Amino acid sequence: FENRSKAYSKYFDKETGFEVSDMGNIYHAVLENFAGKLAESNLTWWNFSEDFALKTVKESVEAYAATYGETVLYSSARNEYAITRMSRILTRTVLTLQQHLKQGSFQPDDYELSFRFAEELDSIHVDLSEEEKMHLQGRIDRIDVSEDAEHVYVKVIDYKSGNKKFDLAALYYGLQLQLVVYMNAAMELESRKHPDKEIVPAALLYYHIDDPTIETPVELTDEQINEQILAKLRMNGVVNSDPEVVERLDHYLQDKSAVIPVEKKKDGSFSARSGILSREEMQLVSAYVDAKIRDIGREILDGKIAANPYEKGNEEACTYCAYKKVCGFDGSIPGYEKRQLEDLDKQTLMQRMQETMEA
């Protein structure tokens, strides 16, 4: 759906093969395997040691790489180094994710949840007409929950090998729907597990899988270095602005959280740099994404495949598109034009979503 919102022809064409530069599959597989190894070792995300992380990640990366035999991953010294680098990055990742969990009261509830194993969920079956139904495909990297006597708070995390940023305007235009779709499915799943409790969306977050370097003109202690690395690996996304939810996500938040995209001003209110939405705004965004997916699905079935990719400021769908020859778009030919997308602020976006839902 996001590809179709960028340029219609991108929906129909898929690339095959494995690129060394695209390590996403390995990252996801190793992180899923790590969670399984914790359970096998009677450990949790809170109490595993750094030595356990180093050993488990290294073995998992090497085992996964071995499944490719003497193909791409071992085809050169450079690619062999990539395996070592992945081990380092993923060790940093599991240690950082451990620290994130220790900051709050959430615990992982599901990993790599494929929609194929959630066939009963209404949120992944979209009625386009009385005769036509669309089935969504996807995989939720991680669902975390925090519970009390009456509520289940839900956090959805999507692992990214690139530095993905949550963009409400991109969501509005149909370019960034995935994370909300995952939250809708996770909310429904938790409601079936806990029919006697209220299910509350807590956070929709991207985690950048990376091992950042710290450049400083002065010598730092190991603790200071780790603090700066943790700050660079703070999750990006949107958080429920309810103080109870924020406190469950980060018990130690004072002025700027090290784990979620939330900052506070001196008076205790959230700063404009915070990625927050109210409970009502989250519900609106959820409903809007459902409607947007239904509209896009209807257009795909109706055969609307005009070559009119989007353009928003300096960003455009064609910049890194591998399907230009398939698309045939040529701006120099009369009749070809790109969709110009406005750069809108949060208040305007929420108002337009509300108007769309009321129409």
Q: How should these model regions be labeled?
A:
Residues F1-A359:
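Structural signature of nuclease core domains in nucleic-acid processing machines
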